[in-house]
């Protein structure tokens, strides 16, 4: 019986080696294992033939079968390692990552130049005793105009083109709406900064936009005078520009101050020689200012017989244009990284 089983063992061995040479993938190898080593495979068929072998020959035949099983298992394991390595290399070649190449540059974010300037202005004025207050961008006609001495039919309302949402609701045209609320909620002395966006229905040019940022400073107490306004403004500009700035105060009209004036500084872009920013005058208007009108104090619940105050407001974009030598306000809103990445902290 040994002679009848031995040829079968040799036949299975040869068939295994032949099939093994055809295997190209781990999936094909798994199918080969099932064919020869599985529960219904060729090797299991040999084990069933043991019952037909003479009892004294069974140990020897069983040894041959086990040797064949070990032979198959070793060859399968060896080929499996080779195929796994081959498939991994193929995948790496398909998804090539050259570790010797430099990594992708990570750009460090930075604050927008307007945000940098706003932070600097708030820092300076906070050191001078002012506290920061904020207010709504969308406000009522009452807080934007009426309480600030703009009666419903006042001709001064025509000075500013306004974005109206409804007949009595609008996008604020200045941050003075914060001053109005501060007077209602606080008793003098009041010393606040009112920063934020404001909106004007204007033509977009190199010097004007439909929205911009404004900072307003308000000081209300007993015996506040023009001398306090001039001293505060000059000290603020000196700290902001880090040098003594030549200023010019011109009489002007604003409904919420009396008397009113405009503050000009010598153009730092052209050093007073004339450029697009200063309209070739050598001067740039940076603020509107004045002593708070008695009617405004009265509307805010403050007795103008006992208290006085000053207020000034300035456009942030124009200040930054001076600080940075920028001649077009539109650059601030174009989100061009080539422009924005030029600026380090002030």
Swiss-Prot record:
A GO MF term: phenylalanine-tRNA ligase activity
Protein name: Phenylalanine--tRNA ligase alpha subunit
InterPro entries listed in its UniProt record: aa-tRNA-synth_II, aa-tRNA-synth_II/BPL/LPL, Phe-tRNA-synth_IIc_asu, Phe-tRNA_ligase_II_N, Phe_tRNA_ligase_alpha1_bac, Phenylalanyl-tRNA_Synthase, tRNA-bd_arm
Gene3D superfamilies linked to this entry: Bira Bifunctional Protein, Domain 2
GO CC annotation, single: cytoplasm
Family matches, as NCBIfam families: pheS
Keywords: Aminoacyl-tRNA synthetase, ATP-binding, Cytoplasm, Ligase, Magnesium, Metal-binding, Nucleotide-binding, Protein biosynthesis
Annotated catalysed reactions: tRNA(Phe) + L-phenylalanine + ATP = L-phenylalanyl-tRNA(Phe) + AMP + diphosphate + H(+)
Localization of this protein: Cytoplasm
Family as reported in the entry's similarity comment: Belongs to the class-II aminoacyl-tRNA synthetase family. Phe-tRNA synthetase alpha subunit type 1 subfamily.
PROSITE patterns associated with the record: AA_TRNA_LIGASE_II
Quaternary structure (record): Tetramer of two alpha and two beta subunits.
């Amino acid at each position: 019986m040994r002679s009848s089983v031995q040829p079968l063992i040799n036949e299975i061995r040869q068939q295994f080696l032949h099939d093994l040479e055809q295997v190209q993938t781990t999936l094909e190898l798994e199918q080969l294992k099932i064919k020869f080593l599985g529960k219904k495979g060729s090797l299991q068929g040999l084990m069933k033939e043991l019952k037909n072998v003479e009892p004294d020959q069974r140990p020897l035949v069983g040894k041959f079968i086990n040797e064949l099983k070990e032979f198959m298992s070793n060859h399968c394991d060896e080929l499996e390692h080779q195929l796994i390595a081959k498939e991994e290399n193929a995948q790496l070649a398909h998804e090539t990552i050259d570790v010797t190449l430099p990594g992708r540059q990570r750009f460090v974010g930075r604050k927008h130049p307007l945000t940098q300037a706003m932070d600097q202005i708030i820092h300076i004025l906070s050191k001078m005793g002012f506290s920061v207050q904020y207010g709504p961008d969308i406000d009522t006609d009452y807080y934007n105009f009426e309480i600030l001495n703009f009666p419903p039919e006042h001709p001064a309302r025509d000075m500013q083109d306004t974005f109206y949402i409804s007949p009595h609701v609008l996008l604020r045209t200045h941050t003075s709406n914060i001053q109005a609320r501060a007077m209602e909620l606080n008793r003098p002395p009041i010393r606040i900064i009112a920063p934020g966006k404001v909106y004007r229905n204007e033509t977009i040019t190199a010097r004007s936009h439909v929205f911009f940022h404004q900072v307003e400073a308000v000081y209300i107490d007993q015996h506040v005078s023009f001398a306090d306004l001039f001293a505060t403004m000059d000290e603020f500009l000196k700290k902001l520009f880090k040098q003594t700035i030549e200023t010019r105060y011109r009489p002007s009209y604003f409904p919420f101050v009396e008397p009113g004036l405009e503050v000009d500084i010598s153009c730092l872009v052209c050093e007073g020689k004339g450029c697009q920013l200063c309209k070739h005058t050598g001067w740039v208007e940076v603020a509107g200012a004045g002593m708070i009108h008695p009617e405004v104090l009265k509307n805010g619940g403050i007795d103008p017989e006992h208290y006085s105050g000053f207020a000034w407001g300035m456009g942030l974009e124009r200040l930054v244009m001076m600080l940075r030598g920028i001649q077009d306000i539109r650059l601030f809103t174009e989100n061009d990284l080539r422009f924005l990445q030029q600026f380090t902290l002030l």
